[in-house]
Amino acid sequence: MLFRSFTLIAMGVGFGYYAYFEEGNLFLNKIFYLLNQNTYSVMENDVLVAIPLFLFMGYVVERANIVNRLFFSLQLATRHLPGSMAVAALATCAIFATASGIIGAVVTLMGLLAFPAMVKANYHRGFASGVICAGGTLGILIPPSIMLIVYAAIAELSPLRLYAAAIFPGFMLAGFYMIYVVGYAFFKPSIAPKPIEEEIPPTKVIILQLVTSFLPLALLILSVLGSILLGLATPAE
């Protein structure tokens, strides 16, 4: 995606150079002035200050080992569903996306956390890889998406409106992923075997693990996204 982005930028500069071409002024083309002016106007946007802050928030969540405990507690809570580990991975991706906002962090963390666990449980490798990649892309839509902040700065739109418009489609897409995974694992159980009942702890322990792992993330999500969507604070604040 990064390579394609630079390719599109180069194409735009090339066509602009051709449109403003004047003989004898090879290095005084207007496109260079416009490129510099537009780049500076985008980079001085205050909204972009939120990007490193959201990245830091995701880093803190990852280092706190909350995502690890959340994944395994969700796996146990959904153990009666076909493909329970895949469902837990998708749910964890959607929740962690609200605390990181970047695709790479979600894919990398879940690839190191959920993929080995699914392979160890005899899940099909291609199926497990697809689940991780699909869940990682949820970070594009679900606020606080870094891509939405960049798009808002470039298109001169309100990040608040973009967040409000993207949050429902993001979680709806996550729900569709889970429905597909459950249906696929139901009709083809060999790709996602059910967990062994002997390894499952008591229900009280599962509920306690789920609450203690989800509650800190829920408070963080409500405080950050709630204040933004209610208009109490800007993304940078």
Regions found by a protein language model. Name each.
Residues 1-237:
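Alpha-helical transmembrane segments of multi-pass membrane transport proteins
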